[in-house]
Curated annotation (Swiss-Prot):
This is Aspartate aminotransferase, mitochondrial. The gene is Got2. Its main location: mitochondrion. The modification N6-succinyllysine is found at K73, K90, K107, K122, K159, K185, K227, K296, K309, K338, K363, K396, K404. InterPro entries: Aminotransferase_I/II_large (IPR004839), Asp_trans (IPR000796), NHTrfase_class1_PyrdxlP-BS (IPR004838), PyrdxlP-dep_Trfase (IPR015424), PyrdxlP-dep_Trfase_major (IPR015421), PyrdxlP-dep_Trfase_small (IPR015422).
Length: 430
């Protein structure tokens, strides 16, 4: 104790004789980060936190974009469990993957998206790299554009678009613009507005398109509308950047959900494409995705692949192994693939059924509003058309949680709570 005491005394004496030492000590005590402001909470995660604090036994969380079964529980696909068992039985190692990811997974992902008989695949004029789910695919794609797309820095997003699109492209150094997409008057697709805006986009700009199950609106163009949009994209020489996070999950048919991507390619439009297996395989936490660039020829594809690897190396070196093995096992095994496609259709059909039941229950409640847009929309999300003040009432009076824009995750609706939800919506809209 004496030594400690004498140390403090000597330290104090040194500071007294040398004021600079005291100033230095004070500077060390202060933080480097006093200028950092508190960031805003994530709007969707904020909904979940509020939901968790609610003690109402009838509470509903319709904010989170994750599939739930008809009991409201997280759902692990049986095909995923079988694939995991097969992988475990092989006693495989845990070595690093190559920078571009698991080769079998990349090949199978390209086939799933473009079709097994795609001319692009047969000619080898494409490159697919494994990414950290769809978000990682978008960031890799955005970084590639920033470095090599020399024609424009502008990326045109539909209004609205997935909330993460803006920070992903902005943080990669791209500039964000918008084009009309959703019509709040009809709760449907503003086709004439979208076509007019796209036709006015400067040539050689980047156009982001949701391949299916548009997030957050659930509003998709019809095939004939996609055809007209593709014609304008080709005429204006725009670069089509597709985000396909829900293949198979939208309609229950993977080929149907990939129709727009395949049509653009058939029209001679060389696209890039982001894929995610979070929703259609339920591999949320495994972070499994892919980024594909369709090129002029195989030689160009090799050059693009080399630069994608150079971009990926300082970002995360190489992607995760386990989820890619699961997805590749399912996609390359005929029996597992067949089972998986049936399970995906089952999930999609349940969501479609919940949309129908919600509208039916709203009619039973006596609602005089037209709710057809709920069944017209597709995929996990639905833009209800509810106003912010109505959303607030739903939360306060009925413990029904959703984002302020009125978007609900239909996956959170079950046969056990759809009647309660319809009653709550009717009460705040009548």
């Amino acid at each position: 104790m004496a030594l400690l005491h004498s140390g403090r005394v000597l330290s104090g004496m040194a500071a007294a004789f040398h004021p600079g030492l005291a100033a230095a000590a004070s500077a060390r005590a202060s933080s480097w980060w006093t200028h950092v402001e508190m960031g805003p909470p994530d709007p969707i995660l904020g909904v979940t936190e509020a939901f968790k604090r609610d003690t109402n036994s009838k509470k509903m969380n319709l904010g989170v974009g994750a599939y739930r079964d008809d009991n409201g529980k997280p759902y692990v696909l049986p095909s995923v469990r079988k694939a995991e068992a097969q992988i475990a039985g092989k006693n495989l190692d845990k070595e690093y993957l190559p920078i571009g990811g698991l080769a079998d997974f990349c090949k199978a992902s390209a086939e799933l998206a473009l079709g097994e008989n795609s001319e692009v695949l047969k000619s080898g004029r494409f490159v697919t790299v494994q990414t950290i789910s769809g978000t990682g695919a978008l960031r890799v794609g955005a970084s590639f554009l920033q470095r090599f797309f020399k024609f424009s820095r502008d990326v045109f997003l539909p209004k609205p678009s997935w909330g993460n699109h803006t920070p992903i492209f902005r943080d990669a150094g791209m500039q964000l613009q918008g084009y009309r997409y959703y019509d709040p008057k009809t709760c449907g697709f503003d086709f004439s507005g979208a076509l007019e805006d796209i036709s006015k986009i400067p040539e050689q700009s980047v156009l982001l398109l949701h391949a299916c199950a548009h997030n957050p609106t659930g509003v998709d163009p019809r095939p004939e509308q996609w055809k007209e949009m593709a014609a304008v994209v080709k005429k204006k020489n725009l670069f089509a950047f597709f985000d396909m996070a829900y293949q198979g999950f939208a309609s229950g048919d993977g080929d149907k959900d990939a129709w727009a991507v395949r049509h653009f390619i058939e029209q001679g439009i060389n696209v890039c494409l982001c894929q995610s297996y979070a929703k259609n395989m339920g591999l949320y936490g495994e972070r499994v995705g892919a980024f594909t660039v369709v090129c002029k020829d195989a030689e160009e594809a090799k050059r693009v692949e080399s630069q994608l690897k150079i971009l990926i190396r300082p970002l995360y070196s190489n992607p995760p192994l386990n989820g890619a093995r699961i997805a590749a096992t399912i996609l390359t095994s005929p029996d597992l693939r067949k089972q998986w496609l049936q399970e995906v259709k089952g999930m999609a059909d349940r969501i479609i059924s919940m949309r129908t039941q919600l509208v039916s229950n709203l009619k039973k409640e006596g609602s005089s509003h037209n709710w057809q847009h709920i069944t017209d929309q597709i995929g996990m999300f639905c833009f209800t058309g509810l106003k912010p003040e109505q959303v607030e009432r739903l939360t306060k009076e009925f413990s029904v949680y959703m984002t302020k824009d009125g978007r609900i995750s239909v996956a959170g609706v079950t046969s056990g709570n759809v009647g309660y939800l319809a009653h709550a919506i009717h009460q705040v809209t009548k």
